[in-house]
Structure formats: C-alpha cells, structure tokens
Regions:
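Acidic, metal-coordinating catalytic segment for phosphate/diphosphate chemistry
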Residues: 110-212
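DNA-contacting surface of Y-family translesion DNA polymerases
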Residues: 2-135
Length: 212
C-alpha cells in the first residue's frame, strides 16, 4: 500500500528487506535521502589529456598553425606533468571555416610528458592532415596515459629526452612560484596567440594563478 516516497521513508526497514531483499534497503535509503555509495578517497585518473582552441581568426598558413599546436601542447603537457603522468598516444583535430572536422592520432615509441616531444608528434600529424582550408578550431589530445616510468630511449636520441625533461621541470618550477606567464617561448612574445591556451582555466591546468 505504499504510494509516495514519504510513505516509503517511514516504512519498517526489516519488513522491506524481507519482501524486496537488498533492493528494499536501497530504495528505503534513497527515500530517506541517504547515499550509501562507496566513498572514493581519490578521483579516478584521467584516461587522456587534451585541449582545444577556437581561434579568433582564420589560420591559413602552416607556421601559425604550428604556433597554435605548440600553445595547446604547452597546456596539455603541463597538466600531464602536474599529475605525474605521461602519454603514449598523441592526436590532433582540426575544424575548418566550413565546420568540416578531421582528426588523426599516432602511437609514440615511448610514453612521454615532455612538451617538445609531444609537440613534434602533433606537428607531424597536422602536416599529414591539413588540406589547406582555413582553420577555426584546433585541438591536441593525448591518450594511453600511465604513471611516469622509465623512458624507452631511441637509437639516435642523443640525450634529447633528458634535456627536454630537465627544461620542462625547470620551467614548471618557475611557473609554479611566479605564475605561468613569467616564462614563455620567444615565438609568443607580442603574438596574438597566447603561449598556453585551451578550454581549461589556469588553476586546473597548473595549480597556479599568479605570483604572490
């Protein structure tokens, strides 16, 4: 004879459990506003890290597109490193002025979190994908992420990965202390493209707002 949630809330719990088993306890807790879901001590890890940007102008040349890719990669990699993660797959997406969309991705030889390695992969993908139509939105995305581990060196690496990693670590530390805008690449000085861009605020991507 239960017709309302209020009536359910004052029902005898043991009676409900006898008739409806575990489901009876579940709906009784629900009626009384009790959430008995397991408490998560940690948020689930990201399955991927990515950022996209709608440009305020049509991107019509490769060099400008590369700058947008670098700007997005700076943000993506800062987030990877802040979480102690690295990515084994890199992808890019392009939307042109006519809202036609394309995307492509590649798997890296070894997972990485360095800005320049992921940028080089994204730039190469862009050169394969772009058909020279004016671009209005671009995205850089990573997947196959895992906690940072041992890098698989390539035959002709010549220590570049370690150099890139030390450079990123130094820049991250300076930005953490003084704000992300205190260090930026020369290509972004007096440039209409911000040196770190994407649809996520500064606190979420680096934990930094400004110097104090």
């Amino acid at each position: 004879g239960i017709r309302t949630i209020g009536e359910l809330a004052v029902m005898d719990l043991e009676l409900l459990k006898r008739h409806l088993k575990k489901q009876g306890e579940f709906i009784w807790n629900y009626a009384n506003g009790r959430d008995v879901s397991p408490f998560l001590r940690e948020l689930p890890r990201n399955k991927g890290y990515g950022n996209s940007m709608t440009t305020p102008f049509d991107v019509t040349d490769r060099e400008t597109a590369w700058q947008v890719i670098l700007s997005l990669t700076e943000t993506v990699c800062a987030r990877l490193r802040a979480d102690g993660m690295e990515a084994a797959c890199v992808g890019i997406s392009i939307t042109d002025r006519e809202f036609r969309h394309g995307s492509v991705q590649t798997t890296l030889i070894s997972a990485t979190d360095t800005t320049l390695e992921i940028y080089e992969a994204a730039r190469s993908l862009f050169d394969r994908l772009w058909n020279h139509s004016p671009i209005r939105q671009m995205g850089v995305h990573t997947s196959k992420v895992s906690p940072k581990g041992h890098y698989q060196y390539q035959l002709f690496d010549r220590g570049l990965h370690d150099k890139y990693s030390r450079l990123d670590a130094a820049v991250d530390e300076i930005r953490k202390r003084y704000g992300e805008d205190c260090v930026q690449r020369a290509v972004f000085v007096e440039n209409r493209i911000p040196h770190m861009s994407g649809g996520i605020d500064k606190v979420k991507r680096t934990g930094v707002t400004k110097a104090v």
